[in-house]
């Protein structure tokens, strides 16, 4: 798969469980006034819940269209990220907050507008970016760090998120820097997973393990994967505000063996499921593609491997911590099982059962099993 296909896959996934404390223990903070741009989608509710649990005062800014009534007791300012649409950002004028957490910014023009308007009224601007905003990923087994250059576009004025999601996030970061150069925090998550994720890119795995039987495991156990539980990310965002962390942070677990991830997921939800490892070359012959048919995996010998090989050392040193893979698997499956039956029958990612069975049958035939 080419980088452009990977970017398209990430963009396609754009879219409240208990929040046990996993972040490194810190003293109870002084209450802060926080503004969250968004707050009612996937990452937002987890961030709001954790901020409230920490004693902070939260104000939401959104269009009032997603999950209405989710936080009825919170002040919600209705507006639009686009300053040219209806009242735009006018509801934020003249207000002051200790920090803003921007988890709904995708277009540099709009992010620049909010950062410029709030520059004199917030102490810190935390922007949720993406690990794919880098110019390119590292190849050859070296873990990429925050010093890698950002992506560039031939046409920086484009607002085509479906084609240039990653690059536009890089320009969003630049827009925040231009407005608030010394008080900006860029949190760069990889694949965000867990309860409320509507993309199913991760969810496919616990759901598939729970179904049982023979499960196609792509590649080799030693290939790498990376992700972050949405609740761990939410806690880190609030932690960055409480601690005043400025700068860029890769927010992913450090690369872990693909085999241990699949085994942990299986053991958490259905230890009787059987993993059958099928090499990358055979999968390619049968049109099984990473980040298309199977998510969270790339062959260690392919150029795509660098997409799952980023260093999180800086964020970990700043306080980012991770819950066990088994907990993420169990909680995600429990949430998924609360969805309507028709939705549960229509996974939005991963191989359908017929294709998986056909590839496994072909593999066994080749191996003489």
Predicted regions and their residues:
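Conserved Rossmann-fold cofactor-binding substructure of NAD(P)-dependent oxidoreductases
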Residues: 78-96
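N-terminal Rossmann NAD(P)H-binding glycine-rich loop of SDR-like oxidoreductase domains
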Residues: 37-54
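N-terminal export signals
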Residues: 4-25
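Substrate-positioning beta->alpha
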Residues: 200-205, 218-243, 247, 327
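Mid/C-terminal beta-alpha module of Rossmann-like enzyme folds, strongest
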Residues: 236-313, 330-333, 340-368
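N-terminal Rossmann-fold cofactor-binding loop
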Residues: 61-65
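NAD(P)-cofactor binding segment of oxidoreductase domains
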Residues: 97-151, 171-173
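Conserved beta-loop-beta element that borders a ligand/cofactor-binding pocket
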Residues: 129, 172-196
């Amino acid at each position: 798969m080419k980088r452009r296909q990977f970017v398209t896959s990430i963009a396609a996934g754009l879219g409240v469980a208990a929040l046990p404390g996993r972040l490194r223990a810190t003293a109870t903070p002084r209450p802060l006034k926080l503004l969250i741009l968004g707050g009612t989608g996937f990452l937002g509710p987890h961030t709001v819940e954790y901020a409230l649990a920490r004693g902070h005062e939260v104000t939401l800014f959104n269009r009032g269209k997603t999950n209405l009534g989710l936080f009825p007791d919170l002040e919600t300012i209705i507006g639009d990220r686009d300053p040219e649409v209806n009242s735009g950002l006018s509801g934020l004028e003249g207000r002051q907050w200790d920090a803003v957490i921007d988890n709904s910014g995708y277009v540099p023009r709009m992010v620049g507008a909010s950062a410029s308007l709030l520059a004199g009224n917030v102490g810190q601007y935390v922007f949720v970016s993406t690990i794919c905003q880098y110019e390119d990923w590292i190849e050859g087994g070296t873990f990429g760090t925050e010093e890698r250059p950002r992506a560039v576009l031939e046409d920086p004025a484009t607002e085509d998120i479906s084609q240039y999601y990653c690059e536009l996030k890089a320009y969003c970061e630049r827009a925040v820097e231009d407005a608030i150069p010394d008080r900006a925090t860029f949190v760069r998550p990889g694949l965000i997973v867990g309860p409320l994720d509507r993309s199913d890119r991760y969810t496919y795995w616990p759901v598939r393990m729970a179904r049982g039987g023979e499960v196609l495991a792509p590649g080799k156990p030693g290939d790498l994967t990376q992700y972050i539980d949405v609740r761990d990310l939410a806690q880190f965002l609030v932690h960055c505000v409480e601690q005043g962390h400025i700068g860029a942070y890769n927010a992913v677990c450090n690369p872990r063996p693909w085999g241990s991830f699949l085994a942990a997921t299986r053991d958490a939800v259905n230890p009787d499921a059987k993993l059958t490892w099928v090499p990358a070359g055979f999968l390619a012959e049968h049109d099984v593609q990473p980040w298309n048919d199977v998510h969270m995996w790339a062959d260690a010998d392919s150029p795509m491997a660098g997409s799952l090989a980023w260093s999180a050392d800086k964020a970990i040193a700043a306080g980012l911590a991770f819950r066990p893979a088994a907990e993420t698997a169990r909680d995600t499956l429990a949430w998924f099982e609360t969805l309507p039956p028709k939705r549960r029958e229509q996974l939005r990612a991963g191989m359908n059962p017929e294709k998986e069975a056909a590839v496994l049958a072909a593999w066994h035939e080749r191996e003489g099993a």
